[in-house]
Design a protein with these regions (language model features):
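Substrate-agnostic recognition of the 12-TM MFS/MFS-like secondary transporter fold
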Residues: 1-21, 48-50, 60-64, 122, ...
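Intracellular loop-helix junctions on the cytosolic face of multi-pass helical membrane proteins
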Residues: 1-147, 168-170, 322-370
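Membrane-interfacial helical/loop segments at transmembrane boundaries in membrane proteins
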Residues: 12-47, 199-226, 304-316
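Membrane-helix interface residues
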Residues: 52, 170-175, 270, 301
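Hydrophobic alpha-helical transmembrane segments
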Residues: 55-67, 148-156, 221-245, 282-286, ...
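Membrane-embedded translocation segments of transport machinery
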Residues: 76-245
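Helix-to-coil boundary motifs at intracellular loop junctions of multi-pass secondary transporters
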Residues: 132-137, 170, 255-266, 300
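Intrinsically disordered cytosolic tails
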Residues: 167-170, 201, 207-209, 277-308, ...
Length: 370
């Protein structure tokens, strides 16, 4: 698939010295600036060694992030008012209140267990090394990873949004978490069995995707061409699997608000800062552990000094280490979800009771102020 490297269109994501020597020499002759990139990458030509690639990515994604941040501020502007949350009044909260919340708020305790294990194993699932091994070694076609990401992203988001809108509204957030969790477990088992019985073992001819790019309309017509059966089934399985399991990871943020309301119901104290800080800390901690978990898995199959890359030949050890990180470890996280949700007290009915009680407390506070 074409990649721009120092203003030259390189016909493949990575050109290797062994297989593409003449092609590399021709490109260097056209643009001598490529010579330094070839030297740094050991005779190969890869977009990863091109500073211009990362400059472009920084500007593009930084700009998009800024636009979306402004959109979020505009959307929340009118609702970001104390009368819509907590008790509608300012309260003094001390260290003793935080300690009591952590010690006795069963809802936040269980949600932290659920969210941390979910985050850890979702991070191993999407780790860069795991994707390199899955697409570059097992499928033998790392260039297909870009098409895979763009083809699956929108359907996964749509499925997640539709399910969340339907299930969370009718059954409550705890039920949504469990639906996403069991969907993730079932999907993981299905993908494991599929890859076990239809393992390409590095044969790129068995795994091919269209050269589709969301930002390039000229490629949209290729979406329905260039598929192999293995690739098509895998992509459909991943879309269904990821769309359903996204419920469990996406619903966590709104469940923290329920935990804050539960604390108001339990003690009369509103401590949203504690909830946000706790989740931010857990998120950063477990995200940093994901790379260590992945490294441990691959070290068990012989990669103690360096992790596999796209030039590493296929082996059964790599297959099982990748399957472990991609689908089996997430099952462990989802089983932790099931256990945590068993002890999570905030059902849909309980939240209705809590909201009624908070409404009563607010009314009493307003009457006193009047």
């Amino acid at each position: 698939f074409p990649i721009i490297v120092t203003d030259v269109l390189v016909p493949k994501f990575t050109l290797t010295a062994e297989a593409n020597a003449a092609e590399i020499a021709s490109l260097v002759a056209q643009n001598p600036a490529l010579a330094g990139i070839v030297e740094k990458s050991g005779g190969s030509l890869s977009a990863f060694y091109n500073p211009g690639l990362f400059t472009t990515m920084q500007l593009m994604f930084g700009g998009l992030s800024a636009v979306f941040a402004v959109c979020a501020i505009i959307a929340l502007w009118r609702k970001d008012n104390p009368k819509y949350f907590g008790l509608g009044t300012t309260q003094k909260v001390g260290i003793k209140d935080y300690v009591d919340t952590l010690a006795h708020n069963r809802a936040i305790q269980m949600l932290v267990v659920s969210a941390s294990t979910d985050k850890l194993f979702m991070s191993t699932k999407s780790n860069a090394t795991v994707m390199i091994c899955l697409f570059g070694i097992i499928f033998g076609n790392y260039a297909a990873y870009s098409s895979y990401s763009q083809i699956t992203s929108i359907p996964i988001c749509l499925i997640s949004i539709l399910l969340m809108n339907k299930i969370a509204r009718q059954m409550g957030q705890k039920a949504s978490m469990l639906v996403g969790t069991w969907g993730g477990i079932i999907g993981s088992i299905a993908i494991t069995l599929f890859l076990f019985f239809f393992n390409p073992k590095g044969d790129a001819s068995k795994f091919s995707l269209p050269a589709f790019r969301l930002i390039r309309p000229d490629t949209w017509g290729t979406l329905f061409t260039g598929w192999t059966t293995t690739a098509l089934i895998f992509v459909l399985l991943v879309i269904a699997w990821s769309g359903v399991q996204a419920l469990s990871s996406s619903i966590v943020i709104t469940m923290t608000a329920d935990c804050a309301d539960y604390e108001v119901y339990r003690t009369g104290k509103y401590v949203p800062g504690l909830m946000g800080t706790l989740f931010s800390f857990v998120d950063k901690l477990v995200s940093s552990l994901a790379a260590t978990v992945v490294a441990l898995f691959y070290s068990m199959v012989g990669f103690k000094d360096a992790l596999p890359d796209t030039m590493t030949p296929y082996s059964d050890g790599i297959f099982w280490a990748t399957i472990g990180c991609f689908v089996l470890l997430p099952i462990v996280g989802w089983l932790c979800n099931v256990v945590a949700m068993h002890f999570y007290p905030l059902t849909k009915e309980k939240m209705e009771e809590i909201q009624a009680e908070i409404g009563r407390i607010k009314a009493e506070a307003a009457a006193k102020q009047a």
